[in-house]
């Protein structure tokens, strides 16, 4: 399990397709960060609310600029590590990786894209944009 910040960056993905990351990474593993305009503290709070509304989660670690969430699959009980990094710029960097196996059939990417959409909809709806 390679989680946490190292020199202000999320860990790169291993050479398996079951991981995506917004900082660095090759094309296969890249996902865009979430951009927002507004207060960082409000973005941190909203990401927390969004992920807490999803099934099978456990907050594993949290600081003022980092959130590590474990997602447990319903059927097999596999754990995926999902991380959010809130640097001082108005972006949220993300990483999602399966702990075991090779392919995830795009599950990690789909999860982060779902979180992105939910965040952006609520950010706009709540008048933070």
Residue spans for each PLM region:
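Ser/Thr-rich, low-complexity intrinsically disordered terminal regions
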Residues: 1-129
